[in-house]
């Protein structure tokens, strides 16, 4: 059920409102725990889809990354020129239009 909810959120919400018995409430509580992406799962650059304590790191060219506990981007990972989050001692060096790579 978790996969169905992540792919088809509208259908998932419809099922919750359609069934109001105890099993629907229990299922809703289980669903709430899977709304955020766990460490190692894909995320968007905004990072709002990562679970608490995680942030979106290691972006690719499309602006997607992986949820991780680290607070900065390591050497060799993509970074935004306008909002660089490279680790200490690294700079975001331009590699294309609007993005770069963390390097020394």
Swiss-Prot record:
It is found in: Secreted. Residues 36-102 are annotated as: 2 X approximate repeats with cysteine pattern C-C-CC-C-C. Disulfide bonds join 36-51, 43-56, 50-67, 72-87, 79-92, 86-102. Residues 1-22 form the signal peptide. This is Phi-xibalbin(3)-Xt3a. Domain repeats lie at residues 36-67, 72-102. Expressed by the venom gland. Not found in the whole body. Probable neurotoxin. Induces potent, selective, and permanent activation of ryanodine receptor 1 (RyR1). Does not significantly modulate RyR2 during toxin exposure, but surprisingly RyR2 activity increases somewhat during washout, suggesting a binding to the receptor. RyR1 assays of recombinantly expressed domains 1 and 2 show that domain 1 causes an increase in channel opening, while domain 2 makes this activity persistent, probably by binding to an adjacent receptor site. It comes from Xibalbanus tulumensis (Blind cave remipede). The keyword Nucleus does not apply. Keywords: Calcium channel impairing toxin, Disulfide bond, Ion channel impairing toxin, Neurotoxin, Repeat, Ryanodine-sensitive calcium-release channel impairing toxin, Secreted, Signal, Toxin. Belongs to the xibalbin-13 family. Double-knot toxin subfamily. Negative results: does not affect alpha-7/CHRNA7 nAChR, alpha-3/CHRNA7-containing nAChR, Cav1.3/CACNA1D, Cav2.2/CACNA1B, Nav1.2/SCN2A and Nav1.7/SCN9A channels. Does not elicit an increase in intracellular calcium in SH-SY5Y neuroblastoma cells. The keyword Lipid biosynthesis does not apply. The presence of a 'disulfide through disulfide knot' structurally defines this protein as a knottin. This toxin contains 2 'disulfide through disulfide knots' that are separated by a short linker.
């Amino acid at each position: 059920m978790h996969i169905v909810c992540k792919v088809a959120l509208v259908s998932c919400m419809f099922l919750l409102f359609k069934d109001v018995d105890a099993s629907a409430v229990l299922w809703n509580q289980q669903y709430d725990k899977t709304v955020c992406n766990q460490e190692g799962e894909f995320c968007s650059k905004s990072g709002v889809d990562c679970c608490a304590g995680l942030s979106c790191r290691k972006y690719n060219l499309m602006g997607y990354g992986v949820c991780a506990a680290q607070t900065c981007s390591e050497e060799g990972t993509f970074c935004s020129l306008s909002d660089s989050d490279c680790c200490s001692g690294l700079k975001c060096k331009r590699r294309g239009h609007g993005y770069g790579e963390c390097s020394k």
